[in-house]
Amino acid sequence: RNRKICFEEPRMYDWNFELAEKTTTIEKAKEYTANWNDMKKNHIGFLLWGPIGTGKSYIAGCIANALLNREITVKMTNFNTIIDDMFPLEDKTEYINALARYELLILDDLGTERNSEYALGIVFSVIDRRYRSGRPLIVTTNLPIKQLKEETNIEKKRIYDRILEMCVPLYVGGSSYRSDIAHEKMGKMKTFFATAESSQAENIIEQTGTKTI
């Protein structure tokens, strides 16, 4: 039940450190969960940043599942979902307050939301309310850390300044996680078809009584 509340996609239920490639970033994420009580007490979060497809969301999901296993309340969502959910609501404040009540809030893919004044206002309201709650926040983004630190747009700058105050930047690099998954699937597909063709050929031989030379 907690995972249904936390995640928007069932595939995320199985994201865990045991299945993750052993990297420095993964080790730091594991340390974060192992020291959760201190992280919570000191309001320390993560800013997972880096190129597209390197596994930032997966790492955040691993952290979420590790904490959910300990009955800690976690919500992982993104601003496109938040903005869509809030648009028809008369009481937007209660929605934002509800997000602030989770022991850990994970905001995925910062920077992919709409760039309108309304959307940026919602983003700031959620971040600012979380800031004032004193609870940890994890953010993932494809935006370079340099851009976050040197943003000149006033509305974006106040958002990024809040995040950088709350979250420790952690670079997630290496090869594209999505490309690696696609490559792995392609390899499995080739193996499957090769096995299928071999099996089909053997069946034909058995049925006709012929042999190949």
List each language-model region with its residue ranges:
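Walker A/P-loop nucleotide-binding motif
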Residues: K41-G61
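Residue-level preference for the first positions of well-ordered beta-strands
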Residues: H43-L47, V74, L104, P136
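Pre-Walker A (pre-P-loop) alpha-helix and adjacent loop at the N terminus of AAA/AAA+ ATPase modules
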Residues: Y13, L19-F46
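Short glycine-rich substrate-engagement loop in P-loop NTPases that contacts/grips substrate
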Residues: E27-K30, A64, L68-L104, R114-G121
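Interdomain "pre-motor" coupling segment immediately N-terminal to P-loop NTPase/helicase cores
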Residues: R1-E8
